[in-house]
Design a protein with these regions (language model features):
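Amphipathic, heptad-repeat alpha-helical coiled-coil "signal-transmission/dimerization" linkers
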Residues: 1-5, 9-12, 16-19, 23, ...
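Conserved short strand/loop->alpha-helix "switch" segment adjacent to the catalytic nucleotide/phosphoryl-transfer site
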Residues: 10-19, 23, 45, 96-126, ...
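Short acidic helix/loop segment immediately C-terminal to the autophosphorylated histidine
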Residues: 12-13, 37-49, 74-75
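Short beta-to-alpha transition helix within the HATPase_c
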Residues: 53-61, 65, 77-94
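Short beta-strand/loop element within the Bergerat-fold HATPase_c
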Residues: 139-151
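Glycine-rich nucleotide-binding loop
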Residues: 141, 163, 195-201
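Acidic ATP/Mg2+-coordinating residue in the GHKL
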Residues: 159
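ATP phosphate-binding glycine-rich loop and adjacent ATP-lid/helix-beta elements
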Residues: 166-193
Length: 206
């Protein structure tokens, strides 16, 4: 019995090491892709294409940050949502030259599986706010709250911008991604209101 227990412990430790190494390699591969996109972007003098490539770059970065955190931590099953979301917020703020304050209150851990979807959703919400919600040279505010208890989670995102144009909303890839990730991957209840700026509420269980 003692030998079997020791063998199981060794096997689990080896599995943990392999998974951490996998996260490290995935992160490095994503960083290479990001670098290639950035180099290509620097060679192009077209603002629309520049924004498109930056958006793609940030989507990959959102996934890369998660793999980086999973590699750094002792556990690979959960991630600190505050630490993860801070990285995404910082990335978006550096990518777009807008005077927008991002105020956030995030206090929970997330499973690594849910975290990848939440990170991508947050990335798209922030991208939409920074790109479309505010007129050029006008300041704005984004509020994010995210809490979890007993495997029940609530994400509330809002900005005080112009709101969504219904026609743009239907054709927006970013909004389509948000709805697909929220409803099909997280199995979340989703509510979007656009009366004064934009407010998005997500609720789901794990």
């Amino acid at each position: 019995v003692s030998n079997k227990t020791n063998n199981l412990i060794i096997a689990l430790e080896e599995k943990e090491i392999l998974l951490k190494e996998l996260n490290h390699r995935v992160k490095n591969n994503m960083q290479t892709i990001i670098s290639l996109i950035r180099l290509q972007n620097d060679e192009i003098n077209d603002s629309k294409i520049n924004i498109l490539l930056t958006t793609i770059q940030n989507r990959i970065s959102a996934m890369s940050h998660l793999h980086e955190l999973l590699y750094q931590k002792d556990t690979i099953t959960f991630v600190d949502a505050n630490e993860y979301f801070e990285k995404i917020i910082s990335e978006i703020k550096q990518s777009f030259e807008h005077d927008i304050d991002v105020i956030y209150d995030i206090n929970c851990n997330l499973s690594s599986e849910s975290a990848i979807y939440c990170g991508l959703i947050l990335n798209e919400l922030l991208t939409n706010s920074f790109k479309h919600a505010f007129d050029e040279n006008k300041s704005g505010i984004v509020n994010i709250s995210f809490f979890g208890k007993n495997k029940e989670y609530k994400l509330v995102y809002s900005d005080n911008g112009k709101g969504y144009n219904p026609n743009i909303k239907k054709s927006s890839l970013g909004l389509t991604l948000i709805e697909t990730l929220a409803k099909k991957q997280l199995k979340a209840e989703m509510n979007i209101s656009t009366n004064e700026g934009v407010k998005v509420k997500l609720r789901w269980k794990e």
